[in-house]
Structures are given as C-alpha cells and as structure tokens.
Amino acid sequence: MSFLQTPAWGKTKAGWTSQSLGWFVGDELVGAGLILLRKVPKVEKYLAYLPEGPDLNWANSSDVERALKALVVFAKDRGVFQIKMGPHTWVRRWQAETLKSVIALESAKVIGEVPPDEVNQSGIALLSQLKAMGWKQRKAEASGFGDYQPRYVFQIDLAGKTEEQIFEGFNQQWRRNIRKAEKEGVTVRQGTVSDLEIFHTCYLETAKRDHFTPRSLSYFQTMWKAMREETIERIALIIASHPDHDGAIAATTMTRVGNHSWYSYGASTTAARDLRPSNAVQ
C-alpha cells in the first residue's frame, strides 16, 4: 500500500476531507483505501480522489468490478461528480541498464518511447477492463506525470543487502561523490521536527533555482505531525550539514509503509553543491 493511502495523508491535505474505506466479503477485509473529497464552490458537489489507490486485488477482474461499482455507489451517495484514482500496479518495466543505454545513444526523448524489458499482462488486462467500465486514463505529460502523481517511478530493491553491497551497486561517479562529501567534512544525520525549519529554508532555495512552486512550512509540519502520530517510522527527515555553512546544505524527507520507502521531497543549496551533499544524503 502507498503512503498516499494511509489515514495520515488525509490529515495532511488542506482543503480536502478524507475517509478511510474498507471492502468486505462477509467479515473478511479484501480491500482498503483513502478517499479524499474536495467541495466545488457554491454547489453541493465533490471531486473524489484516491491517490495511488485503492488497495485492491487488481489482478482479479471480478473483484475489481465489484469493488469499483461499490465505490461509485458510495461516491454518488455523497454528491461526488467525478472520481480520480491511481491503481497501485504496473504495466511496463525498464531496467536501469536499458535506460542508461538510451540516454547515451539519445535514441528516445521520453521514457514511453523506450521498448520495455518486461510487460505485465495483468496490468494490460486491467487497463482494458477499466476502459470497458467507463474509466478514462489521462495522457501522461511530457514531464512524466499522469494528472497528480508521477506516471513512472524508479524502484531499487535493497532487501538482504549490506551497506557495502548497496554502495558497490552505485555507479563510479556516485561513489566518488559520496567519498568526496565525506572527505570534505559533510555529515548526515536524522532530523527531528525542529529541523523542519532549516529543511524548509533549503527547500525554498531549491524551488527558486529549479522554478517550481514550493510547499509552505506549515504543510511539512502538518505532514510530520500526522504521520508520526500514526507510527514513528512513517516519515523521516535526513539532513546534510557542513561546519562552513549554516543550516542544511541538503536534505530529504522519506516516507515509509512496511518495507517500502519513498523519496518524497529533496532540497539542496547552490553554495555547497561542490561538496556533493545531495549524494551523501541520498
């Protein structure tokens, strides 16, 4: 299950109300999800959104049909005029080496043009089923986003690997940058709620440099509080610092559900880039 389907995420989203849903067969829980509702101004209508959800058995077509029909009934009873969802499954998969070779040869402009290494037939069948049921998939933007969430994600399997094995799995340049950061005196630590302010200062600089609209400090404070109340492992803040620079020179937030972690937000300062703190913190 994605962290975007946890009750804590609903508490993070200002302007939305949220409700946790469960699908049952008798007394058995067979599916779960977080539904976000946003009211349309001046009318009693709502937009419903299930980010990276709901958590269903997407490989079973009959289960999917029953679950989504029940979801539509639930939503209509609450004045919902449109439902957005993001089934947490996959259709195509690329290995890192495949993408590296494409980048080196400049043979494709976007990832969708690259022939996949694997195709998930269950995922293809699900797409066909959803279209037949009247659901529509928005075309991915050039940036790789499909509506609100990234259409493509990169996953690294760390299970059973030592820290040394993980380090050796990095490419040569990445290993060199980490060693340089260590040699230059960059230190990395796990932050606390009080460190959100120095993270946010670094994050604002990143937003200005990279031309994106930043989140407010209160957004991160709300997210931290909600997720930490759910479980202390749900969110972590990693800070890189250096004696010659005030505050954070790089930082990232990491969210976690079970054994799966997500890189959520990242930040770095321009002045300390040569120290390679981003490599160290990641």
Which positions does each model-derived feature cover?
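Acyl-donor binding region in acyl/amide transferases
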Residues: E44-G146, G258-Q282
